[in-house]
């Protein structure tokens, strides 16, 4: 097989940041994707419709004229969020979903939720109007091992939300464990999960073996190979509960390569090529389109895209650019630990 055609993909989890970084990274996503859910964890975070609309306008200015792209905006959930303002924001079309960050779980999440029960009235309202809840599924207790934070969040927090509000549309984002895969499979139809290309490609050895690899450091952190295999099987299965959310997360090189480096992998540039290679390696190319282009739209109950893209398999591995420029600095581009032969044709 030399070429395949798929429905133009969607990225159901993207970080565009702001200002110079935003202008540099937006075209890397809009080249290959039709829609993206945009994360709200800026400094300061996106807390209301007015801020979301202003942020969307900044994103739209950075989209190349040749690309047709729709940013889907989110609001950062806090214990002070006004549920009536949130309802108006959703009903007006200004906001697509709400993001729940446990306080301190990841980049710019200090304003997040400390007590799930305090936001339950907001979640009840969201269930009533059909507004999706996006969850960074990790506990943040300092005594909890970082490799166990997703599993414990599912047991202690997610299960409570799902059982209390089974009608709430929930996405457990960037899953990394076999426990997450099993929980999502067994849950009702309103719970889905996004999976990133770097969690499909790497395990925790890829951070530590042969020296620290700061550009493979992300949150949730990479897990054991057995967990990677579990999420790969979920992604390639065609099961419509699992879909692509790249969690592409740009940081300047100097903010990654230091004594306390930032968490995040910038994977937008070659995401689709990497996924095609992974699916081919597992003899599952027939399910690539479901994962990248169909399952997410089904979960969010919106129409799938009408445009298509063509992927071509080259005779030699494609050459990845190492970085993209941002002013005097740059952002390192994710490159997996295997050859990639698939190219997206323009």
Please state what every model-predicted region is.
Residues 19-26, 80-91:
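Short, acidic/polar
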Residues 163, 235-304:
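His/Asp/Glu-enriched, well-ordered alpha-helical/loop segment
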